[in-house]
Amino acid sequence: MTFKTEQEAFWAGDFGTEYIQRNQGDALLASNLDFFAKALRQARGIRSCIEFGANIGMNLKALKLLHPGIDAHAIEINAEAARQLGDVIPPAQVHHSSILDFSPARQWDLTLIKGVLIHIHPEVLPQVYDRLFAACGRYLLVAEYYNPSPVAIAYRGHSDRLFKRDFAGEIMDRHPQLQLLDYGFAYRRDPNFPQDDITWFLMEKR
């Protein structure tokens, strides 16, 4: 696989594989169930979904429990994560690819990206926004670190690996057919169902 940015190679390599061990387990699944029940409370009729940057499928596990029978697809850049993802959804529906190399051949009721845009180089974000929009049949859920203006911060000792900004606002500016339906915040110190200080935005394509 050939990469266009340093960030893609970073997540496809050993760091991305190590990430798997830090992000799994029943506690995370419970938090994800709570998260998606809240974030998707305004959504109706979700029968299919695609997740951009799904890792081993912890988000999709929760969505499958909340929406039994959902037709779930995913894109994942890391080979080991993509292999494990094939235990959660049918392997044929796992796209082992960089998001920048993915061209949606169809649309899904729900398009999801959670904790991924923050790790993509800002110069290629417009390309990612366009792919998210193209894949979106009705709902787009963006769940990321939020900052009103773009900022880069160190990530586990690495520079240029974590970027905060108003991702959802930029997507809606670029694609006015998307309208904000709901939004909220998930706090890392929540006593019951913590998440990693994620601000989420549910948009609907109209």
Range-by-range predicted roles:
Residues 118-120:
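A short His-aromatic
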Residues 112:
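A conserved beta-strand element that flanks and buttresses the S-adenosyl-L-methionine
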